């Protein structure tokens, strides 16, 4: 029963990731209709791209963690909850960014818009760093458990070695 609930939660988490990605794309497309100062702001583009990086950490690494025998189903559920929380926060940042790209927000000055963009950029950068840290710590837990069993090569084969992107 517990594994069925965990599997259900994981599917919901993945669906949430897809939803957030689609929101980000919609907001980015809406930038085409906004003042040149904001539309050309590199930070807006980077903020949206960072969501893709966060989603990539989740999708690529959590899929590997699901096949890792060093994690229990309860631990995988907790890890999925951690990623979900980060993705929800990233979705909130995109909602804040929506204020900038929303044409009906005519009362905002360019400075107000740039302040919102800057705040969103900083928060998304923090969330991206948090996601990398969270992923690396979970992989290191698996590695330490594998080390106790003299099975580190399997973990390296699964996640890659230290020279690779995620850890």
What do these predicted ranges mean?
Residues 1-40:
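Start-of-domain marker
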Residues 51-123, 127-133:
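Extended amphipathic alpha-helical interaction segments
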């Amino acid at each position: 029963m517990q594994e069925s609930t965990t599997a259900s939660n994981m599917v919901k988490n993945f669906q949430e990731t897809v939803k957030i990605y689609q929101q980000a794309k919609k907001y980015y497309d809406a930038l085409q209709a906004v003042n040149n100062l904001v539309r050309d702001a590199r930070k807006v583009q980077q903020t949206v791209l960072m969501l893709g990086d966060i989603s990539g950490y989740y999708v690529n690494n959590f899929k590997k963690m699901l096949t890792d025998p060093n994690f229990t189903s309860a631990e995988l559920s907790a890890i999925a909850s951690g990623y979900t929380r980060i993705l929800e926060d990233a979705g909130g940042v995109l909602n804040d960014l929506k204020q900038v790209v929303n044409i009906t927000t005519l009362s905002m000055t360019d400075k107000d818009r740039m302040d919102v963009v800057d705040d969103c950029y900083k928060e998304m950068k923090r969330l991206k760093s948090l996601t990398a840290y969270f992923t690396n710590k979970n992989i290191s837990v698996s590695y330490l458990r594998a080390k106790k069993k003299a099975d580190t090569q399997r973990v390296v084969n699964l996640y890659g070695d230290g020279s690779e992107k995620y850890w």
